[in-house]
Amino acid sequence: KGIRSVQKHKKRLKQGDFFPPFLYISIINSCNLRCQGCWVDVAAKQEKIDVEKMNDIIGQAKEMGNSFFGLLGGEPFLHKEILQILEGNLDVYFQIFTNGHFITPEVAKELKRLGNATPLISVEGTEIVSNERRGKLQVLNDTMEGLHNCLDAGLLTGVCTSVCQTNYEDLVNDAWIDRLIELGVMYGWFHIYRPVGPDACPELALTPEQQYNVRKFVVETRAKKPIVMIDAYHDGDGNALCPAATGFTHHISPWGDIEPCPIIQLSKESIYDERPLKEVFNESEFLSDFRKIAAESTRGC
């Protein structure tokens, strides 16, 4: 289905129409953690997209041939209706970006019953580093408990890391990947740390050499380890890639703003505008100009 969504997207482009084949939706801004470099103002007044509006967004996207959605936060499992959103849309698939703290055995079993979501659980380093990176205590223990609940329930589960100076040595190595494989994790995703948000911490950003090494490690791991490694920053030929510049993805914030991606929090349109999403994506000069300028000036994130 995902491949068909991309094929329909490419066909639309040839006809002068635009609608991204993949939508990432931050359904709530609240979170129990306070991570360094988080692009969401999690301490702000809670904002969320309700079930009715989510069903509307997903329904409009399905009409365009979309079948895959990313759910983000804040912490998505703080949205009390997240399971209702999943159950109301069993004909599409969701990837849920989560810290895992609210995935109890019961929640994991319900996700398994629904069968249309994969949890992508974030691990940010050792116990000490996790506490520092995420602004709370016992973070790693709670995350690993959620991870084990997912695996015990038989869920297709991934682990992601925002790779930065304090976890680069601990997690970008064979030992960590081997541990994930031993646990039963099916896929990994290394994000490159971007210093943004209320607590940007630019000192945590990787050097160009370290970024290159992360890419090299991902490629080499794909060839020798029984685990899928995702890389959102390069295409199949190894060229730097910005998914928003290609138009493959765009993002909807908890406030309903339609943005290039979660990190670029600039918008002129909203899901609450009295226009169908098809019209918004086709007529947005801001998004069109962003894609054009980003593609011309740099392919990378």
What does each of the following model-derived ranges do?
Residues 31, 35-38, 242, 256, ...:
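Short cysteine clusters
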